[in-house]
Amino acid sequence: MVKAKSWTLKKHFQGKPTQSDFELKTVELPPLKNGEVLLEALFLSVDPYMRIASKRLKEGAVMMGQQVARVVESKNSAFPAGSIVLAQSGWTTHFISDGKGLEKLLTEWPDKLPLSLALGTIGMPGLTAYFGLLEVCGVKGGETVLVSAAAGAVGSVVGQIAKLKGCKVVGAAGSDEKIAYLKQIGFDAAFNYKTVNSLEEALKKASPDGYDCYFDNVGGEFLNTVLSQMKDFGKIAICGAISVYNRMDQLPPGPSPESIIYKQLRIEGFIVYRWQGDVREKALRDLMKWVLEGKIQYHEHVTKGFENMPAAFIEMLNGANLGKAVVTA
């Protein structure tokens, strides 16, 4: 019998998550039924959305999340043993699936690319960058794009796609190491928002003429400050608000209606799962092509060991990761 280890939500987070909010449980899995497959996790993802999505979990439930898994036993002809799949199995080492919701990797996945990229640049974060920038912001060559949390899994891809499309790109991140990385991957300007004397002045210095598109990963005061720097008819794609996810005190005031009205801005929140079918498939192929051609570079922040899932999650929320945070099982 196979034993599965799972990290469960022991209690809902109060402010910043802590190790004591999680509990590691072990269960014995039953034999497979017809149509089922047994999955073994290879790589697991930790992402900012889990912080707010966890509010919908019942205490004691397995933490949600995506993983790259190997089919180790199968009674489902669509997923023979040895297949590599993407699964929404959560924080667990082994999982029995009926095959629904499993996704095979692109058939032409080359051996030289790590499978973990299916959780990052050629996966959900990459798709988020792709559709948020190209569909929500609808960027065109010659425009100026601002990205917050620019050295993260999503932001780093946003900036590189924007450069591919002929845009000027400005990134904000929270350490000098991250700023150096942004310049290495082609950002035109980047600044450490934690050390600048004035965020408003830093934004003006990076692009005196303002911004056509702002890809927002942080929300809060940063978003409010950016509004006055937007060009008329500018577009803002609201992807996340990691700066306020852990706050227990009163949230900062919302965006200024005056700036939105008189600049005639368009602000749109979005979830990547809006785009499915052929457009999603094309986006994945575009991302893989750009990675293989060296037009999109990637960096992974890898934590070894399933036992370290909570620590990896907490570190990611604290901004310790450069690029995509993944855990090896």
Curated annotation (Swiss-Prot):
SMART domains xrefs: PKS_ER (SM00829)
Encoding gene, per UniProt annotation: Ptgr1
Record PTM Phosphoserine, positions in chain: 20
Residue numbers bearing the N6-acetyllysine modification: 178
Subunit architecture: Monomer or homodimer.
GO terms of biological process kind: leukotriene B4 metabolic process; lipoxin A4 metabolic process; prostaglandin metabolic process
Protein name: Prostaglandin reductase 1
Superkingdom, taxonomy of origin: Eukaryota
Organism: Cavia porcellus (Guinea pig)
Binding site for NADP(+): 152-155, 178, 193, 217, 239-245, 270-272, 321
Pfam families: ADH_N_2, ADH_zinc_N
Alphabetized UniProt keyword annotations: Acetylation, Cytoplasm, Fatty acid metabolism, Hydroxylation, Lipid metabolism, NADP, Oxidoreductase, Phosphoprotein, Prostaglandin metabolism
Job of this protein: NAD(P)H-dependent oxidoreductase involved in metabolic inactivation of pro- and anti-inflammatory eicosanoids: prostaglandins (PG), leukotrienes (LT) and lipoxins (LX). Catalyzes with high efficiency the reduction of the 13,14 double bond of 15-oxoPGs, including 15-oxo-PGE1, 15-oxo-PGE2, 15-oxo-PGF1-alpha and 15-oxo-PGF2-alpha. Catalyzes with lower efficiency the oxidation of the hydroxyl group at C12 of LTB4 and its derivatives, converting them into biologically less active 12-oxo-LTB4 metabolites.
Family as reported in the entry's similarity comment: Belongs to the NADP-dependent oxidoreductase L4BD family.
